[in-house]
C-alpha cells in the first residue's frame, strides 16, 4: 500500500505545482497587459524599475491610424476634396481672367493712339 499512497501523493503534488505555475503565468500576463510603471525623476525624465524588464512593454504606435481614418471617413472626405478642388479651380480661372483683362488693357493702351480717358488736369508729361 505504501507505493500506491506515494504515487497518489506525487500526483497530487504535481497537480498542485501545475496549478500554481498556471496561476503565476496568468498573473504575469495580467501584469503585462497594464501600462508600464515609471518612476518620475523630475524634469520629464523617467526610469523603468529594475527587475523583470519583460513586464514593461512600450506601447506600439498605431501604424494604420491614418489609413483607418480614411477608410471610415473616406467617402465624405472625398466629396469635400472634390468640392474644394472645383471651388479652387473656379477661383483660379476667375483670377487668371482678371489678370488677362488687366494685362490686355495695359497693352492696348500702350499701342493705341488715343489719349488716356482719365482726366488729370494738374498732371503734366515731359515729352522729348
Curated annotation (Swiss-Prot):
Residues where Zn(2+) binds: 125
TM regions (residue ranges): none
Omega-N-methylarginine found at: 50
Subcellular localization(s) per the UniProt record: Cytoplasm; Nucleus
Keywords attached to this entry: Apoptosis, Cell cycle, Cytoplasm, Metal-binding, Methylation, Nucleus, Zinc
Chain positions covered by the region annotation Disordered: 1-44, 103-128
GO MF entries: metal ion binding; molecular function inhibitor activity; signaling receptor binding
UniProt GO cellular component terms: cytoplasm; nucleus
Region His cluster, residue ranges: 117-121
InterPro entries listed in its UniProt record: BEX (IPR007623), TF_A-like/BEX (IPR021156)
Positions with biased composition (Basic and acidic residues): 20-33, 115-128
Record-level GO BP terms: apoptotic process; negative regulation of protein ubiquitination; signal transduction
Domains: entry comment: The histidine cluster (His cluster) and Cys-125 mediate zinc-binding.
Entries under PANTHER family matching the protein: PROTEIN BEX1, PROTEIN BEX1-RELATED
Family: Belongs to the BEX family.
Function: Regulator of mitochondrial apoptosis and G1 cell cycle. Regulates the level of PP2A regulatory subunit B and PP2A phosphatase activity. In absence of reductive stress, acts as a pseudosubstrate for the CRL2(FEM1B) complex: associates with FEM1B via zinc, thereby preventing association between FEM1B and its substrates.
Subunit structure comment from the entry: Interacts with LMO2, possibly leading to regulate the transcriptional activity of a DNA-binding complex containing LMO2. Interacts with OMP.
Entry protein name: Protein BEX2
Name of encoding gene: BEX2
Amino acid at each position: 500500500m505504501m507505493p500506491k499512497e506515494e504515487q497518489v501523493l506525487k500526483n497530487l503534488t504535481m497537480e498542485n505545482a501545475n496549478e500554481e505555475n498556471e496561476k503565476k503565468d496568468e498573473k504575469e500576463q495580467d501584469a503585462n497587459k497594464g501600462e508600464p510603471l515609471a518612476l518620475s525623476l523630475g524634469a520629464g525624465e523617467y526610469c523603468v524599475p529594475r527587475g523583470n524588464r519583460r513586464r514593461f512593454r512600450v506601447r506600439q504606435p498605431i501604424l494604420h491610424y491614418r489609413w483607418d481614418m480614411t477608410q471610415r471617413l473616406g467617402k465624405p472626405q472625398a466629396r469635400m476634396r472634390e468640392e474644394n478642388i472645383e471651388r479652387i479651380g473656379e477661383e483660379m480661372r476667375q483670377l487668371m481672367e482678371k489678370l488677362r483683362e488687366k494685362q490686355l488693357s495695359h497693352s492696348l493702351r500702350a499701342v493705341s493712339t488715343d489719349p488716356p480717358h482719365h482726366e488729370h488736369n494738374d498732371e503734366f508729361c515731359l515729352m522729348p
